Amino acid sequence: MHETTLKREGASTPSNPTPSTHAAGSGKIYIRTFGCQMNEYDSDKMVDVLREDQGLEMTDNPEEADVILFNTCSVREKAQEKVFSDLGRVQHLKKLNPNLVIGVGGCVASQEGAAIVKRAPYVDVVFGPQTLHRLPELIRRRRDEGVSQVDISFPEIEKFDNMPPSRVEGATAFVSIMEGCSKYCSFCVVPYTRGEEVSRPFEDVLTEVADLADQGVREVTLLGQNVNAYRGRIEGSDEIADFAMLLEYVHEIPGIERIRYTTSHPKEMTQRMVEAYARLPKLVSFLHLPVQAGSDRVLAAMKRGYTALEFKSVVRKLRAARPNLTLSSDFIVGFPGETEEDFQKTMKLIADVGFDTSFSFVYSRRPGTPAADLQDDTPQDVKLKRLQQLQALINEQAAAIAQSMVGTRQRLLVEGPSRRDPNELMGRTENNRIVNFEGPSRLIGNMVDVIITHAFTNSLRGRVAGTEESDQGAA
């Protein structure tokens, strides 16, 4: 489970914190974010609505915050206990600042609802992914009525109609184009925590992307639980825009130079989507396409809706359209009933397809899902051993891809200072590889060509491309 705070890193707790003394309208907000990019996007929107309504600004120190929010994820095991553990760490701040508001949002909030307040009465607001736009109202009601507020309803796409314009810094941005999931995989809680699939209107998405481009954004990542299931209403028409059509229109927005999207579903990878990789050069040569397993028996038990052969067929079509396409994927190891033979079929699929990265986990039972009722008789040590084998194979493939890039010419979007050395810069290739290199700060936010000189485990090193003579031989 991915975990961030806005400002991207949580602050440590001093032994003698001081109470917050900010006046209304000049306070601060601290958000800790768990989970996927959708949650990161939602956290940014929480800041936007509270900044516009109450003048709050971000802090990376919970001790100076007037509002503390936890944006939670319920995908992994023991997510609820993690939330209560984190809540316990900030409870003492209430005594120091009685006006402090503590809130829980995201998918755990959607699952647990009022049970969070019952167990942790010091929590002031509980809200779901679809009601984050109501945060200012919930906070006001909590302060006016003195009673904790809970709103985990599913008002479909309403939240996007109540969002202030995005305010971004940097050359990249997320744009949520749909919410929820209607696939109901047997292991997954998302349909129960985020609701059914609902797409934003076509023009709304294009307007947001165009506004971001006007602010200097060069790369957008289109977000959705099943992003390629997008079906957006076109204003003044009975026509519905599918995801391929949306990509075609985003591709034409001036200023946008790269388009990414996540997360996609193999069943929704239409022929028109495949053809987009041949026709739309701004669509990057990197795709996250979760497969989960390589055994047809396990895939059927997961209710994924495709076979291993069908998945490989989709990949073949995509790579025919874009030969240099690299893939990442999701894998669940130790799903109930998985045999050694099933696992070896997953390993064969990985060997056949080739992946650059993966998010792979040991199966964890999620209450309320159909898979929770299946007998889970695989010993934990066996699951962990399989996970290690799977990750080792993908790491081997990733290392080979990285090594193959040494000596090649790659176009980067320069995102900012390098995390390894603040005197250097960091950019990202089309296939999502981080490259550290020396260069002037004026390159930040721009595209630049580099020659890859070294490959490491989690990054590449390069130098800014010079003349053709000095770079002779670079592909």
UniProtKB/Swiss-Prot annotation:
Residues that coordinate or bind [4Fe-4S] cluster 1: 36, 73, 107
Q: Which UniProt keywords apply?
A: 4Fe-4S, Cytoplasm, Iron, Iron-sulfur, Metal-binding, S-adenosyl-L-methionine, Transferase, tRNA processing
Q: Which Enzyme Commission number(s) are on file for it?
A: 2.8.4.3
Question: At the top level of its lineage, which domain of life is listed?
Answer: Bacteria
Q: Which cofactor does it need?
A: [4Fe-4S] cluster
* UniProt xrefs under InterPro entries: Elp3/MiaA/NifB-like_rSAM (IPR006638), Methylthiotransferase (IPR005839), Methylthiotransferase_CS (IPR020612), Methylthiotransferase_N (IPR013848), Methylthiotransferase_N_sf (IPR038135), MiaB_methiolase (IPR006463), rSAM (IPR007197), rSAM_horseshoe (IPR023404)
Q: What does this protein do?
A: Catalyzes the methylthiolation of N6-(dimethylallyl)adenosine (i(6)A), leading to the formation of 2-methylthio-N6-(dimethylallyl)adenosine (ms(2)i(6)A) at position 37 in tRNAs that read codons beginning with uridine.
Name of this chain's protein:
tRNA-2-methylthio-N(6)-dimethylallyladenosine synthase
Gene (UniProt): miaB
